[in-house]
Design a protein with these regions (language model features):
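Beta-rich nucleic-acid/ligand-interaction surfaces
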Residues: 18, 240-248, 255, 294-308
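Short, conserved helix/loop micro-motifs enriched in His/Cys and acidic residues
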Residues: 246, 250-266
Length: 308
């Protein structure tokens, strides 16, 4: 599934006209561009713009507004209205761009999976950025500005007596997360009583994975590494029951709770990384015949999927 010759990430240093043209021309399997804005409900937009159109007007996409939509396509409650619905997408060149591959569609010329370059964007309404990513970005800028001013007024910081607040030039916010989720066989549900008993007896926590669950988890960790997220581990969580084996040796009645962990990052990049990780998890487990839920409480009465 992972190919070392394929492109997975384009860093901010490479997001200029010359380098992008060289990279995308060298990878003809990347056939589309998608501009990813995140609305107030956490939905990330996705489109399929031909790569030829992007390269033809690359300066316009990079410097101007990459695309536009109307307020009915995104959740911007109280902002985009019927008589003022235009929402523009402005490319964010301060974070990594990722190539999203279709595991079921192959380029006839190269034999590789067809890829879509996903470019994170800000959603702009009336020349004001109004999306979730911009709120996080602006909040961090504001907090940094206020803290730097505070440190200059009060240079002696408790616990940091060895430095002066006046010498602090920049504050870098780092953040990390863990992703818990439930996986199950489609159209098959485990009894709540069995799930509750298994949880009380701690039968599943950090236990060995088997069958397609193990395969999917291992493939997920490999893909997180390919995208540069720095995976640290994947393991079973406290919820779930043992799956069953059918006459052909395949796992059935799978119902398990898993967790994935990867390295910390900075500000908005951390949020983008989690969106990418969710897509990777969903796609890989689907290819292995399993459904994934990131809901906080998908199964009543048993452990939910926390995040901290």
């Amino acid at each position: 599934m992972m190919n070392p010759d394929m492109l997975y990430v384009i860093s901010p240093e490479e997001q200029n006209r010359e380098t992008l043209t060289e990279i995308l021309t060298a990878h003809p399997e990347i056939k589309f561009v998608s501009f990813m804005g995140v609305d107030f409900a956490g939905n990330d937009t996705d489109e399929k713009v031909p790569i030829s159109l992007f390269l033809k007007d690359i300066d316009g996409f990079l410097e101007g507004m990459a695309a536009q939509t109307d307020g009915s396509s995104v959740v911007l409650t109280g902002i985009a209205t019927l008589n003022n619905a235009r929402v523009d997408m402005k490319i964010d060149s301060s974070v990594n761009w990722y190539i999203d591959y279709n595991y079921e569609h192959f380029d006839s010329a190269t034999g590789r999976m067809v890829g879509t370059l996903r470019i994170p964007c800000f959603l702009v309404h009336n020349n004001v950025r109004v999306d979730s990513r911009s709120i996080l970005h602006d909040t961090l800028d504001y907090v940094e500005k206020e803290l730097l001013e505070l440190f200059k007024k009060h240079p002696q910081i408790a616990g940091l007596e060895h430095i002066s607040g006046e010498d602090i030039e920049k504050i870098i916010f780092t953040c990390a997360t863990e992703l818990e989720f439930w996986v199950k066989s489609p159209r098959e549900d485990a009894p709540i009583e069995a799930l509750s008993s298994s949880q009380m007896m701690q039968e599943q926590y950090w236990q060995r994975c088997r069958g397609n669950v193990r395969t999917a988890l291992e493939q997920t960790v490999e893909m997180l590494e390919a995208y540069g997220l720095g995976p640290e581990m994947g393991h079973k969580e406290c919820g779930g029951v043992r799956g069953q084996i059918d006459d052909n040796g395949h796992m059935t009645h799978v119902m398990e709770q898993l967790e994935g962990d990867w390295k910390y990052s900075y500000g908005v990049q951390t949020a983008d990384n989690e969106l990418l990780a969710r897509i990777i998890v969903k796609e890989i487990f689907r290819l292995n015949g399993l459904e994934v839920s990131f809901q906080a409480k998908p199964v009543p009465g048993v452990a939910g999927s926390g995040e901290h």
